[in-house]
Amino acid sequence: MELHSLKAAEGSRKVRNRVGRGTSSGNGKTSGRGQKGQKSRSGGGVRPGFEGGQTELFRRMPKRGFLNVNRKEYAIVNLETLNRLEDGATVSAETLVAAKIVKDVKSGVKVLANGELTAKNLTVKVAKVSAAAKAAIEAAGGSVEEA
């Protein structure tokens, strides 16, 4: 076997169907779009969700909730993620961004108790810490300061 004799497996490469290239191709003249009508035109077709004039499903459903303009969105960090830091490290929004654990700080960082904490003596200075996470950090010899 040599490079010039390599061939693709039979049936692995399908020839693209070129429409509008003669009637004997099976997709000539109208290019598989039928005769006249909205869908035969260039740029034609209906928008997603359109139901032919019947009120769309999303309009039949009742409205729910609202978006609070004063909402606070926290960057979430779990205990298992804090294991990437050395023992005795200080955990703050700046150190987490520098360690590439958090990309965008948003309204601050919140530490949650997902996973097991193996890093010891961490000093955590973030916006929010869940009660379970606080207990786990203090059990591992660390301290928590909520800003």
Curated annotation (Swiss-Prot):
Composition skew (Basic and acidic residues), residue ranges: 1-13
Stretches for region Disordered: 1-57
Composition bias type Gly residues, residue spans: 23-35, 42-52
Protein's name in the database: Large ribosomal subunit protein uL15
GO biological process: translation
Family (UniProt): Belongs to the universal ribosomal protein uL15 family.
One MF term in the entry's GO annotations: structural constituent of ribosome
Signal sequence annotation: none
Record function comment: Binds to the 23S rRNA.
InterPro entries: Ribosomal_uL15 (IPR030878), Ribosomal_uL15/eL18 (IPR021131), Ribosomal_uL15/eL18_sf (IPR036227), Ribosomal_uL15_bac-type (IPR005749), Ribosomal_uL15_CS (IPR001196)
Entry GO CC: cytosolic large ribosomal subunit
HAMAP family, sorted: Ribosomal_uL15
Record has Magnesium as a keyword: no
Entry keyword annotation includes Zinc: no
SUPFAM superfamilies reported for this sequence: Ribosomal proteins L15p and L18e (SSF52080)
Subunit structure: Part of the 50S ribosomal subunit.
PROSITE patterns, per the entry: RIBOSOMAL_L15
Organism: Lactococcus lactis subsp. cremoris (strain MG1363)
Gene: rplO
Pfam hit, one: Ribosomal_L27A
Keywords in alphabetical order: Ribonucleoprotein, Ribosomal protein, RNA-binding, rRNA-binding
